[in-house]
Curated annotation (Swiss-Prot):
E.C. number(s) listed in UniProt: 1.5.1.5, 3.5.4.9
GO cellular component annotations of the record: cytosol
Any one GO molecular-function label of the UniProt entry: methylenetetrahydrofolate dehydrogenase (NADP+) activity
Function according to Swiss-Prot or TrEMBL: Catalyzes the oxidation of 5,10-methylenetetrahydrofolate to 5,10-methenyltetrahydrofolate and then the hydrolysis of 5,10-methenyltetrahydrofolate to 10-formyltetrahydrofolate.
Keywords linked to the UniProt accession: Amino-acid biosynthesis, Histidine biosynthesis, Hydrolase, Methionine biosynthesis, Multifunctional enzyme, NADP, One-carbon metabolism, Oxidoreductase, Purine biosynthesis
PROSITE patterns in UniProt: THF_DHG_CYH_1
Assembly with partners or alone: Homodimer.
Residues noted as binding NADP(+) in the record, renumbered to the chain: 164-166, 189, 230
Identification of the protein by name: Bifunctional protein FolD
Entries under PANTHER family matching the protein: C-1-TETRAHYDROFOLATE SYNTHASE, CYTOPLASMIC, C-1-TETRAHYDROFOLATE SYNTHASE, CYTOPLASMIC-RELATED
Domain of life: Bacteria
Pathway noted in the entry: One-carbon metabolism; tetrahydrofolate interconversion
């Protein structure tokens, strides 16, 4: 069994991005990511701090806009519009979730696609579905693909099962795997017999937010397992969606939680931001 070490790979990517940023600075461009946080969700605050720290590590300027819980939808749209027209800002990220009185889809669609480094804008989703690399790809699925590529895992002809059908992970993940030549099945909470799919899979990607959803009796020998889930137990321990201790015994490759997919998600956000800055140079 080989661990798919996202922490080590993300560190390597950050070093490469640091060099690219030094080149951009020599051309008068400083990569810049604007992050908007609405309210005081503790988890969101932690995520925003980690993103700002990661930016600092590889030479990206970060601007954090922390708005209060009562910020109106129009006020948020006005800020995004200002950032859309600010040439010194190359990436805009709105930290989710948003308060109930704000329409998430409207907000995400208001970010100009050329600064949508999260890859959620309909234009970028369209590029992905057409198999084009013109836009920005969603960070978590992109991080998974980079991780598999780094370990020279050939996806052509692989039977892949994705558990979770969200617009953030499951759906774009399915499209990326299809584009890479895999045969893809997408399962979700209404799937009748999950094991029927997982036992035949060469690759399983779990992104459902459910502790121990994937167990040893549900996988075959030699399976490749990518655990996107992040769950906090009452003890405070962070675990994924996979029964790691048992499933790892049957796996050829598996991601740990933490230090698997999480660091890669942030690395891809940084990579997309630098890509946007480079596009400005071109």
């Amino acid at each position: 069994m080989t661990l798919l070490d996202g922490k080590a790979l993300s560190a390597k990517i950050k070093e490469e991005l640091k060099e690219k940023n030094q080149f951009l600075k020599s051309k008068g461009i400083e990569s810049c990511l604007a992050v908007i946080l609405v309210g005081n969700n503790p988890a969101s605050q932690t995520y925003v701090k980690s993103k700002a720290k990661a930016c600092e590590e590889c030479g990206i300027k970060s601007l954090v806009y922390h708005l209060n819980e009562n910020t109106t939808q129009n006020e948020l749209l006005a800020l995004i519009n200002t950032l859309n027209h600010d040439d010194s800002v190359h990436g805009i990220l709105v930290q989710l979730p948003l308060p109930d009185h704000i329409c998430k889809d409207l907000i995400l669609e208001s970010i100009i696609s050329s600064k949508d480094v999260d890859g959620f804008h309909p234009i970028n989703v369209g590029y992905l579905n057409l198999g084009l690399e013109s836009g920005f790809l969603p960070c978590t699925p992109l991080g998974v693909m980079k991780l598999l590529k780094a370990y020279e895992i050939d996806l052509k002809g692989k039977d892949a099962v994705i558990i979770g059908a969200s617009n953030i992970v499951g759906r774009p993940m399915a499209t990326m795997l299809l584009n890479a030549g895999a045969t893809v099945s997408v399962c979700h909470i209404k799937t009748k017999d999950l094991s029927l799919y997982t036992r035949q899979a060469d690759l399983i990607i779990v992104a459902a937010g459910c502790v121990n959803l994937l167990r040893s009796d549900m996988v075959k020998e030699g399976v490749i397992v990518v655990d996107v889930g992040i769950n906090r137990l009452e003890s405070g321990k962070i675990v994924g969606d996979v029964d790691f201790e048992e499933v790892s015994k049957k796996s050829s490759y598996i991601t740990p939680v933490p230090c698997g997919v999480g660091p890669m998600t942030i690395a891809m956000l940084l990579e997309n931001t630098v890509k946007s800055a480079k596009n400005r140079l071109n």
